[in-house]
């Protein structure tokens, strides 16, 4: 759960987990009583024309509540160097359709952004719909759309986005994966990399994010995520 990603232009990050690929939500939902924790680390070691060096740490927790619903909390805005822009992000995802053997699934979700320090806005929101199809080859592709309210990812503007995912298991433990938010805004990145199941409970994600804007000027960074299923 980036992406969600780096706080840019007053924007905030969104949830990550295999409740996301890297940044874009999946149609996966935790079973009732299941608890998942993840720490997302974004970093750029050098300055560039488009993006200066930084590091960012975003913890979040997700809990399955039953009835194909999960809830969670992200703590975004911990970016160095820079002013503290801590933002609490309660999240909710509801799987409204699970086709089982036909491979189709649909979720709807929402994230509420509540800035705590150095506020660029009082409260923001991201709502989305995501559709995924799993094929007999275990390939899973997804597409959907989302909407960010004013100031969340662009100053003084709202943003509608397209969102896309791709996953292909290579072994029982390793999957190549990619996701993408369309548009020029704080979450407008394409991220590709791998997902490795270290143990039954521990999963590692590693990817590289390239911006939709100013990619040739160095708008890119490394993303590493560590996820743990408690039960």
Locations of regions flagged by a protein language model:
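Bacterial N-terminal signal peptides that target proteins for export
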Residues: 1-2
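C-terminal segment of classical bacterial N-terminal signal peptides
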Residues: 7-15
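Transmembrane beta-barrel domains of Gram-negative outer membranes and organellar outer membranes
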Residues: 15-139, 143-152, 167-175, 179-231
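Charge-rich, low-complexity intrinsically disordered segments
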Residues: 154-159, 165-167
């Amino acid at each position: 759960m980036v992406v969600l990603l780096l706080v840019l232009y007053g924007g905030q990050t969104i949830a990550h987990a295999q409740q996301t690929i890297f940044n874009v939500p999946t149609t996966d939902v935790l079973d009732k009583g299941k608890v998942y924790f993840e720490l997302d680390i974004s970093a750029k070691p050098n300055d560039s024309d488009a993006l200066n060096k930084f590091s960012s740490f975003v913890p979040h927790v997700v809990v399955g509540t039953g009835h194909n619903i999960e809830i969670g909390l992200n703590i975004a805005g911990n970016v160095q160097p820079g002013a503290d822009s801590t933002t609490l992000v309660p999240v909710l995802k509801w799987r409204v359709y699970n086709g089982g053997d036909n491979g189709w699934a649909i979720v709807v979700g929402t994230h509420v952004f509540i800035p705590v320090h150095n506020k660029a806005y009082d409260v923001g929101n991201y709502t989305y719909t995501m559709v995924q199809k799993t094929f007999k080859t275990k390939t899973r592709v997804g597409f959907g759309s989302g909407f960010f309210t004013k100031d969340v990812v662009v100053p003084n503007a709202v943003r509608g986005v397209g969102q896309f995912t791709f996953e292909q298991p290579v072994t029982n433990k390793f999957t190549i994966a990619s996701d993408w938010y369309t548009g020029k805004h704080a979450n407008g990145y394409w991220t590709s990399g791998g997902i490795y199941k270290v143990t039954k409970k521990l999963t590692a994600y590693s990817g590289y994010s390239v911006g939709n804007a100013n990619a040739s000027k160095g708008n890119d960074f490394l993303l590493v995520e560590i996820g743990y299923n408690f039960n």
